[in-house]
Swiss-Prot record:
Gene3D superfamilies: 1.10.8.60, DNA helicase RuvA subunit, C-terminal domain, P-loop containing nucleotide triphosphate hydrolases. GO terms for molecular function: ATP binding; ATP hydrolysis activity; peptidase activity; proteasome-activating activity. Keywords: ATP-binding, Chaperone, Cytoplasm, Nucleotide-binding. The gene is hslU. This is ATP-dependent protease ATPase subunit HslU. Belongs to the ClpX chaperone family. HslU subfamily. It is found in: Cytoplasm. InterPro entries: AAA+_ATPase, ATP-dep_Clp_protease_ClpX, ATPase_AAA_core, Clp_ATPase_C, HslU, P-loop_NTPase. It holds the Pfam family AAA.
Length: 443
């Protein structure tokens, strides 16, 4: 779980996302409150429930990017889902309970990797001994049993030294490694994923774990044996319990496109993929117990962050009960020309840096001048205003069109350099930007 302060979280988000300070502050406070809650005594800790967030803003302003970056910072079970993928219970499609099942699977994987990392040093020692046993088989007594030696032989120590120095990396050895059972692929209708997973687990357990002799280079065998030995040191039951605790206390669910499940106008018949989904989400957000293949998971303290553009619908179109369970509202602002300029230059892996690095692989140097960047930003903003406003995603389209000729000819122009200035941008984009019909289809 992350112990970063709100200011540190915002500072980290600033490296990748331009503007949207209110949204950054809201998620930073929510993340820090997870840590604060764990410092309370158990009685009060149970009473403190997370304050779920609803992020409202046009497409392409950074809602999903905030979620992506938050997942890396949280160091906690995190899942991002699309609200449009779900249908009401009893109808064809995914049920909302699968959100918690997927979150628990992610937590098990995360805890497993952490446990393997904690046991890595011991696993490396055991893997080293297994390789040395192949290189210098231990002495056996008259009954064919391996004798335990108090002190390793001089030859074994010499080989250990060579192994650690990498002198034996390319030598081939034959070792016995565990083989994973071949998975049985079961086709099931949507909504039956849990049953499918249980059947697959059952067939894998029936097959059991077998060992197979393989011929590998020592460096490859060492990696394989480390993973195998580390897995043996992990207790599966403890791992599952840790994962469930982690989900219940620190889990974060990000629900994107929640505006797409708002009811629009008067419709006849059941609305299974809109209002029905909202009703099914209610118990999850409020707190209930969900059955997963790893055990029962309580959702009372899972943090839910929902986001939507709300261009056609409005937050008040959500059912009142769900509105009440998303108490913190954050509005993200539409991007301006200045924001576009900052997006092109400020993030640690900005679009301009990406294109420079790609062209350098061909031995070609491209550089973006300040007036060139201003012109690119202005062109993207103009196209957004005259056609559909897709926010920062427009920059991808504009830049790809701008660099198209350079990308095509880069392999033939090794050693050359190109400055992308305002004149270059005008030459390649002005005609498209000015013609609304062309920009609608090309940009």
């Amino acid at each position: 779980m992350s112990e970063m302060t709100p200011r540190e979280i915002v500072s980290e988000l600033d490296k990748h996302i331009i503007g949207q300070d209110k949204a950054k502050r809201a998620v930073a406070i929510a993340l820090r409150n997870r840590w604060r809650r764990m410092q309370l005594d158990e009685t009060l800790r149970y009473e403190v429930t997370p304050k779920n967030i609803l992020m409202i803003g046009p497409t392409g302003v950074g809602k999903t990017e905030i979620a992506r970056r938050l997942a890396k910072l949280a160091n906690a079970p995190f899942i991002k889902v699309e609200a449009t993928k779900f249908t009401e219970v009893g109808y064809v499609g995914k049920e909302v309970d699968s959100i918690i099942r997927d979150l628990t699977d992610a937590a098990v994987k995360m805890v497993r990797l952490q446990s393997i990392e904690q046991n890595r040093y011991r696993a490396e020692e055991l893997a080293e001994e297994r390789i040395l046993d192949v290189l210098i088989p231990p002495a056996k007594n008259n009954w064919g049993q391996t004798e335990t030696q108090v002190e390793p032989s001089a030859a074994r120590q010499a080989f250990r030294k060579k192994l650690r120095e990498g002198q034996l990396d390319d030598k081939e050895i034959e070792i016995d490694v565990a083989t994973t059972p071949v998975g049985v692929e079961i086709m099931a209708p949507p909504g039956m994923e849990e049953m499918t997973n249980q059947l697959q687990s059952m067939f894998q357990n029936l097959a059991g774990q077998k060992h197979k002799s393989r011929k590998l280079k020592i460096k490859d065998a060492f990696k394989l044996l480390i993973e195998e030995e580390a897995s043996k040191l992990v207790n599966p039951e403890e791992l599952k319990q840790q994962a469930i605790d982690s989900v219940e206390q620190h889990g974060i669910v990000f629900i994107d496109e929640i505006d797409k499940i708002c009811k629009r106008g008067q419709t006849s018949g059941p609305d299974v993929s809109r209002e029905g989904v909202q009703r099914d989400l209610l118990p999850l957000v409020e707190g209930c117990t969900v059955s997963t293949k790893h055990g029962m998971v309580k959702t009372d303290h899972i943090l839910f962050i929902a986001s939507g553009a709300f261009q056609v619908a409005s937050p008040s179109d959500l059912i009142p009960e769900l509105q009440g369970r998303l108490p913190i509202r954050v509005e993200l602002q539409a991007l301006t020309t200045k924001d576009f300029e900052r997006i092109l230059t400020e993030p640690s892996a900005s679009l301009t840096e990406q294109y420079k690095a790609l062209m350098e692989t061909e031995g070609m140097i491209i550089s973006f001048t300040d007036d060139g960047i201003s012109k690119i930003a202005e062109s993207a903003w103009q196209v957004n205003e005259s056609t559909e406003n897709i926010g920062a995603r427009r920059l991808h389209t504009v830049l790809e069109r701008l660099i198209e000729d350079i990308s095509f000819e880069a392999s033939e122009r090794r050693g050359q350099s190109v400055d992308i200035d305002a004149d270059y941008v005008k030459k390649h984009l002005d005609e498209l930007v000015a013609d609304e019909d062309l920009s609608r289809f090309i940009l």
